[in-house]
Amino acid sequence: MKLYSLSVLYKGESKTVLLKAAYDVSSFSFFQRSSVQEFMTFTSQLIVERSAKGSRASVKEQEYLCHVYVRNDSLAGVVIADSEYPSRVAFTLLEKVLDEFSKQVDRIDWPTGSPDTIRYSGLDSQLSRYQNPREADPMTKVQAELDETKIILHNTMESLLERGEKLDDLVSKSEVLGIQSKAFYKTARKQNSCCAIM
């Protein structure tokens, strides 16, 4: 999972203006970096121009995903990431960056701004921080921990039953489980095996 670009733009009536951008082109060869960066800027502007105000979208281009968020006040953000990067985290990043940007940069400067004239320095740190979505986004971190716990629990149950025992045999021999619980287990087992075949 990788983020390549984080841009803040202004969607004007006649054209879209790049206000500030941060790039991570370290995974590209040295000679390709400037061209890749220019292409990301061009793509970001084009996507914002073609998007309606008040919209969010994800545009796939080969193995990359461009996530765009255009607010109703014409301020827009674009994240370019690989296709594995979680969309929810990308949109969370865009919302956070646009909120910070609108608080720090006067709205009057948006239509005529440029990367040289706009004084906002938060993009590089945000791009770096969100490279690992698990660390940056609490929900993703919790989901990853749940997935790991589920794997550990699954492995533990399998290791308990590896000695030639079957869970079905243990359930039928159990003195703790009532008749109703055993019937419920057998019914659930049949339904799950039926669905697994399909």
Swiss-Prot record:
- Which E.C. number(s) belong to this protein? 2.3.1.-
Q: Which family does it belong to?
A: Belongs to the synaptobrevin family.
Q: What is this protein called?
A: Synaptobrevin homolog YKT6
Per the UniProt record, the lineage of the source organism begins with: Eukaryota, Metazoa, Chordata, Craniata, Vertebrata
Which GO terms of the molecular function aspect are on file? protein-cysteine S-palmitoyltransferase activity; SNAP receptor activity
Q: In the UniProt record, does the keyword tRNA-binding occur?
A: no
Q: Where is the signal peptide?
A: none
Q: What's the source species for this entry?
A: Bos taurus (Bovine)
* Span of domain v-SNARE coiled-coil homology: 138-198
The record's section on Gene3D superfamilies has: 1.20.5.110, Longin domain
Tell me the membrane topology, using the record's own terms. Lipid-anchor
Q: Which residues carry this modification: Phosphoserine?
A: S159
**Any idea which residues bear Cysteine methyl ester here?**
C195
The GO cellular component terms are: cytoplasmic vesicle membrane; cytosol; endoplasmic reticulum; Golgi apparatus; Golgi membrane; plasma membrane
Subcellular localization(s) per the UniProt record: Cytoplasm, Cytosol; Cytoplasmic vesicle membrane; Golgi apparatus membrane
Q: What SUPFAM superfamilies has UniProt attached to this entry?
A: SNARE fusion complex (SSF58038), SNARE-like (SSF64356)
List the propeptide region positions. 196-198
Lipid attachment, kind S-palmitoyl cysteine: C194
Question: Which biological process annotations from GO are given for this protein?
Answer: endoplasmic reticulum to Golgi vesicle-mediated transport; protein transport; vesicle docking involved in exocytosis; vesicle targeting
Instruction: Give the comment on domains.
Output: The longin domain regulates palmitoylation and membrane targeting.
PROSITE patterns, from UniProt? LONGIN, V_SNARE
Asked if Cell inner membrane is a keyword of the record, the answer is no
UniProt domain Longin: residue ranges: 8-131
> Which positions anchor the lipid (S-farnesyl cysteine)?
C195
User: What does the subunit section of this Swiss-Prot or TrEMBL entry state?
Assistant: Identified in 2 different SNARE complexes; the first one composed of GOSR1, GOSR2 and STX5 and the second one composed of BET1L, GOSR1 and STX5.
Q: Which EC class heads this enzyme's classification? A: transferase
Q: How is it modified after translation?
A: Palmitoylated; catalyzes its own palmitoylation. Palmitoylation is required for Golgi targeting.
Which of UniProt's keywords are assigned here?
Coiled coil, Cytoplasm, Cytoplasmic vesicle, ER-Golgi transport, Golgi apparatus, Lipoprotein, Membrane, Methylation, Palmitate, Phosphoprotein, Prenylation, Protein transport, Transferase, Transport
